[in-house]
C-alpha cells in the first residue's frame, strides 16, 4: 500500500494513520502529504470485490455523483487509493440524538433529509449505462439473495430473542416477501445494498458523500430505503421515518413514477 502511494505521489507520505475497521475484511489507511492533503488507501482480500468498487466508483464519477474517486490501483488489484471524503460520518453526527433515545434536533434531522434526498439520484442516475455484470458478488437482487438476508434475520436476530414463533408461517411470509421484493425487474435500479449512516461522510459544508457501495447491484430501490430508515441503533421515531420517506418520494419523482397508494 505504501509503495502504491509513493509511486503515485512521487514521495513518501508525511503521515500514515490506520482507520478503524468497518465490519469487513478491508483495511483502510489515511495518507497525508506535507501540505496536509489526504488520500484513503484500501487493502482488500478479494480482487473481484475490489474490481467492482473500482468500476462503480469510476462510473459514478462520470455521472458526477458524490462518491470517492479511485486515483491509483496496484498491479495486484488488491490495493487502491481513493479520494478522502472527510473524517465525520453521518452516524457520528447523529450521536447526540441517538444518546437521547431518538430525540433528534432540527440540525440532525436536516442531515437525514439531505442524505435520503440524494438516494434516488444514486439509484436512478447511477443505473444509467451501468454494466451490472461487473457487480459483486452478483449482478442483481434475486430470490436467493433475498432469502439470504431473511434467514440472517431469522437465525442471527429472531432466534436469539427467545420469542416463540411458527416457523412454517414465517417461511410462508418470507416467500411472499421475496416475491414482492424481486417484483418487476424492469422497475429495478441501482441498489446500494448497504445504505446506512456509517457509510455516509459529511464534507465541510455538511453535504453527504457516500462510501462502501462495492456490494451494489441491480435491485428494488425500496431495499435501500428500508435499510436506511430501519437501521439498527438509530431509534428513529415513526413520525421521523414518515417525514424521511416523504422526502425520499419527492426526490424520486424526478426519476420515476411514484405510487403512494
What are these regions (language model features)?
Residues 25-32, 122, 177-223, 235-236:
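Active-site acidic catalytic loop and adjacent metal/ATP-binding pocket
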Residues 129, 136, 140-143, 147, ...:
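Glycan-recognition and catalytic cores of secretory/periplasmic carbohydrate-active enzymes
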Residues 151-160, 222-258:
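Active-site activation/catalytic loop segments of kinase-like enzymes and analogous catalytic loops
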Amino acid at each position: 500500500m505504501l509503495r502504491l502511494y509513493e509511486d503515485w505521489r512521487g514521495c513518501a507520505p508525511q503521515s500514515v494513520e490506520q482507520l478503524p475497521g468497518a465490519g469487513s475484511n478491508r483495511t483502510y489507511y489515511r495518507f497525508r502529504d506535507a501540505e496536509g492533503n489526504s488520500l484513503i488507501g484500501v487493502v482488500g482480500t478479494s480482487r473481484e470485490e475490489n474490481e467492482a468498487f473500482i468500476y462503480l466508483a469510476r462510473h459514478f464519477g462520470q455521472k458526477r455523483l458524490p462518491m470517492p474517486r479511485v486515483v491509483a490501483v496496484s498491479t495486484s488489484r488488491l490495493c487502491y487509493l481513493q479520494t478522502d471524503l472527510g473524517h465525520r460520518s453521518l452516524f457520528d453526527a447523529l450521536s447526540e440524538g441517538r444518546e437521547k433515545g431518538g430525540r433528534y434536533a432540527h440540525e440532525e434531522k436536516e442531515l437525514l433529509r439531505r442524505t435520503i434526498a440524494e438516494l434516488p439520484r444514486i439509484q436512478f442516475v447511477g443505473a444509467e449505462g451501468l454494466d451490472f455484470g461487473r457487480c459483486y458478488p452478483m449482478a442483481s437482487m434475486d430470490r436467493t439473495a433475498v432469502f439470504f438476508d431473511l434467514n440472517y434475520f431469522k437465525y442471527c436476530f429472531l432466534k436469539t430473542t427467545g420469542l416463540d414463533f411458527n416457523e412454517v408461517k414465517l417461511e410462508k411470509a418470507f416467500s411472499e416477501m421475496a416475491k414482492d421484493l424481486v417484483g418487476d425487474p424492469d422497475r429495478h435500479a441501482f441498489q446500494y445494498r448497504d445504505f446506512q449512516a456509517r457509510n455516509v461522510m459529511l464534507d465541510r459544508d455538511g453535504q453527504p458523500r457516500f462510501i462502501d457501495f462495492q456490494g451494489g447491484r441491480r435491485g428494488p430501490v425500496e431495499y435501500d430505503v428500508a435499510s436506511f430508515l430501519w437501521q439498527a441503533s438509530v431509534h428513529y421515531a415513526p413520525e421521523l421515518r414518515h417525514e424521511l420517506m416523504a422526502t425520499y418520494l419527492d426526490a424520486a419523482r424526478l426519476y420515476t413514477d411514484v405510487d403512494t397508494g
